[in-house]
Amino acid sequence: MLTVLSPAKRLAARPRLDLPRGLSPTSPRFQNEADELAAVARGLTAADLRRLMHISEPLARLNVARFAEFHEARTAAVPALALFDGDTYAGLEARTLDEDALRWAQDRVCILSGLYGLLRPLDLIQPHRLEMGTRLKTARGVSLYEFWGDRIALALNERATKTGARALINCASAEYFSAVDLEALSLPVISPVFLEEREGERRIVSFWAKRSRGAMARFIAENRLEHPEEILSFRAGGYAFEPDLSTDDRPVFLRTA
């Protein structure tokens, strides 16, 4: 199986990932496209970035500087797993994955990215903020969805062929998974849902759902799961599979608060 994750908005201040001997950082599949997008973003002002991504003035200025130095700062690139530091990656706990799990994840865990399209965990990337939902005008359209088109789906198909994967576990947000052209994708998609029950009401709690998506990716990598039904034994964070609420492509995991 392949597992897809969203990237993180929050980035590590001091990114670090100690790689076992024999494992080395890799280059992004769509580095040329990332360079193309960075060149477009380099022409934007802080006000433009604030408007496009609804971010603060300091964060907008920081990303103006990042895009201005994008090509020159290539030597500062670090593995994606080391840089991303949000709730999903707290659940993944990449720094404590053993060598076998990390090797497995490198081929089968796929990180969606507005700037880089599709990343492997050890792909070298630079600090940036470019959300997939951004309406950034390029020669290919008026949004990043139009820019990426079917290329992310086709890259996932290639990864599936290489690994023998026969299903895709969607642990990404709706914003990011919308960049996967389902008509071009050759894999069935299973999208786990994480619900919390409190005083008889069931709902998605964003913090715990994000963390659980990362924990699910870790569970799959640590146990080298190959079949969708195997994820139903996931128990991290107090969640348990709830068959009465589930369908084949939407397994629901429930916890009681």
Swiss-Prot record:
Gene Ontology cellular-component annotations: cytosol
Highest taxon of source: Bacteria
GO BP terms in the entry: response to hydroperoxide
Family per similarity comment: Belongs to the UPF0246 family.
NCBIfam families cross-referenced by the UniProt entry: PRK02101.1-3 (NF002542)
Full protein name: UPF0246 protein Rsph17025_0016
Organism: Cereibacter sphaeroides (strain ATCC 17025 / ATH 2.4.3)
